[in-house]
């Protein structure tokens, strides 16, 4: 689906210069064959909304030799274990859906910090989630608590920026988090529109980037992330 500003009711099938198909398997194959990407981020919107994860789709994509990062609306350890059994490469635990810090800590301890990526979900800069514990907390506080729980991989994602192509809007936050928590693998996404956005993120302590629309519309090509300053080894693709 083509994400637009986090307004999921307005999401539409992807239109891409890379493939005529909007099916996840075909899109992943195009990322691999046309762009040389070997890792793919997938947001399972139905699972995030409470439906069962689309495990068959995950397996099909992974059969291409593509390592899959999946956000499937993990709430508790049981949800995370189901994705682990599906051999998902990176399990994304989103602030939007996680039951609370206790569940996050349990998942991190059980599966290990290398497997778990905590998504600091924001909307227009404000934390997005149903957890009472973090109600009213700012993004920096939540990130620090996540680190204290064992998180070592953090995604900063402002859903209001998704698909807009005007930058992530989180550069200052990322810079502060990188300074406060140098042990973090810090990833940013939402709104990346061109190579200049990648460069700006790298200059502010970001280790990797999630990109979708800029790949589908041709604004970013492999030569853009293979520049000496780029996030080449970490560039991820998003669906």
Residue spans of the language-model regions?
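Conserved, mostly hydrophobic/aromatic
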Residues: 40, 83, 118, 154, ...
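C-terminal helical cap(s) of enzyme catalytic domains, especially alpha/beta-barrels
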Residues: 103-111, 198, 202-234, 238
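Catalytic cores of alpha/beta
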Residues: 64, 68-91, 172-211
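Short beta-strand/loop segments at the ligand-binding rim of alpha/beta enzyme cores
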Residues: 57, 62-70, 113-117, 121-131, ...
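Glycine-rich, proline-tolerant flexible connector loops at the mouths of alpha/beta enzymes
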Residues: 39-56, 155-166
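Short, acidic/polar
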Residues: 20-33, 76-81, 134-145, 198
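Conserved anion-binding
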Residues: 1-17, 84, 88-162
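Charged helix-capping and loop-helix junction motifs
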Residues: 52-59, 132-141, 166-175
